[in-house]
């Protein structure tokens, strides 16, 4: 099986799938809180020297993939999105394809068994390519998954991205993909006014170039009914998961203040990475 490698130690994923199918997963060992969770006095570290092992949580459409992908590029670690793994399996016409299609189109969560199997295969492939560290996006989604993950490796930090539900619905309904190049875009223009002490949120659409305009397609599961069902299911399952990581001192909750131009610099600051990006830009 694949191994999740960290500096000065490694955590074997041997038996990762078998652990899941056992009646229960052993409780993971409590780890020291990530230095990124401390206040302004937190020491800055060189993330590339740490082979970071991070998890991104958040409702569907919040932008986990966008920010996890950017951090992946900045830190030089793989971004592993379980949603992408599911879509790749759907497109493969493999044995799980039809079953997954029914689950996704109904807005249901894919079972733990399937997700663990797909993730195990991805980690094995990554190890073969010499990858170390990771940023997980979309896993874990359940307490069972979190316990399994905690049993085989130490997570440094869990970033929980947040947006108001009405913004999430609009973002999901605005998602588009170019059927030719495969790039993702968003046609939603969001301008939520602030009220009751809550700041307003403005997000410009992420429009495609001219050559992609006529080739845009919508995901089958991005209908209002399905999106709201997914949000409801996520909210029901996320609270125990958030509390699990909160008690371990690993949860960082981050309210997105707007689109990428507003949110990215503030996220880097919260992660103590703002000066790191500047150094990377100078070195480039």
From Swiss-Prot:
Q: What does the entry list as the binding residues for AMP?
A: 82, 87, 108-110, 138-141, 145, 219, 230
| Reaction equation(s) it catalyzes | AMP + ATP = 2 ADP
Q: In which tissues is it expressed?
A: Highly expressed in flowers and at lower levels in roots, leaves and stems.
GO BP, sorted A to Z? amino acid biosynthetic process; root development; shoot system development
Keywords from UniProt, A to Z, are: ATP-binding, Chloroplast, Kinase, Nucleotide-binding, Plastid, Transferase, Transit peptide
Targeting signal (transit peptide) range: 1-36
Q: What outcome is recorded for mutants in which this gene has been deleted?
A: Enhanced root growth and increased amino acid biosynthetis in the light period.
Q: What Pfam families would the database entry show? A: ADK
Record-level GO cellular component terms: chloroplast; chloroplast stroma; cytoplasm; nucleus
- NMP as annotated region, ranges: 81-110
Question: Which residues are listed for ATP binding in this entry?
Answer: 61-66, 175, 258
- NCBIfam families attached to this UniProt entry: adk
Subunit details for this protein?
Monomer.
Q: What does this protein do?
A: Catalyzes the reversible transfer of the terminal phosphate group between ATP and AMP. Plays an important role in cellular energy homeostasis, adenine nucleotide metabolism and plant growth.
What protein does this entry describe? Answer: Adenylate kinase 1, chloroplastic
